[in-house]
Amino acid sequence: MADDSALHKKYPFLNLLHTPPHRPPPLCPQAPRKTQCKRRLENEHEESNSHLATPCVWPTLDPWTVETTTSSLTITTSTKEGTTVTVQLRL
């Protein structure tokens, strides 16, 4: 049988048999887990205020008005120039 070094010279891929195994790539850091939001469904027997209006609690020159329904939030205020600004978030 031929010498091992002669075989490795003739068949260089045999050298791969003696290489250490490859390390797996480093893992990507995991994203933080989201907290589970528990949605509370309205009970049909409960009374609900379908439309609430609450003035803003922080001091401003022009007060904010916050209105809520079961599926939306609306914030309204006026600029110094008198323009009414309304932001509505639908849930």
UniProtKB/Swiss-Prot annotation:
GO CC field: host cell cytoplasm; host cell nucleus
Record carries keyword Transport: no
PTM info: Phosphorylated by host ERK. The phosphorylation triggers a structural change that enhances keratin binding and protein stability.
Miscellaneous comment as given in the Swiss-Prot or TrEMBL entry: The major E4 form is first synthesized as an E1^E4 fusion protein from spliced E1^E4 transcripts, such that the first few amino acids of the E4 protein are derived from the N terminus of E1.
Domain of life of the source: Viruses
UniProt name for this protein: Protein E4
Disulfide topology: none
Pfam families assigned: Pap_E4
Keywords: Early protein, Host cytoplasm, Host G2/M cell cycle arrest by virus, Host nucleus, Host-virus interaction, Modulation of host cell cycle by virus, Phosphoprotein
Organism for this UniProt entry: Human papillomavirus type 6a
Keyword Phosphoprotein: yes
Localization, UniProt: Host cytoplasm; Host nucleus
One BP annotation, GO: symbiont-mediated arrest of host cell cycle during G2/M transition
Comp. bias (Basic and acidic residues): 39-49
Stretches for region Disordered: 16-51
Protein purpose: Contributes to multiple aspects of the viral life cycle including viral genome amplification, suppression of suprabasal cell differentiation and egress of newly formed virions. Induces host cell cycle arrest at the G2 phase by associating with and preventing the nuclear entry of host CDK1/cyclin B1 complexes. Inhibits cellular DNA replication by preventing loading of host replication licensing proteins MCM2 and MCM7 onto chromatin. Within the cytoplasm, associates with host kinase SRPK1, a splicing factor regulator, and inhibits its activity.
Family: Belongs to the papillomaviridae E4 protein family.
Subunit details: Assembles into oligomeric complexes. Interacts with host CDK1. Interacts with host SRPK1; this interaction may favor expression of late viral transcripts. Interacts with host cytokeratin components KRT8 and KRT18.
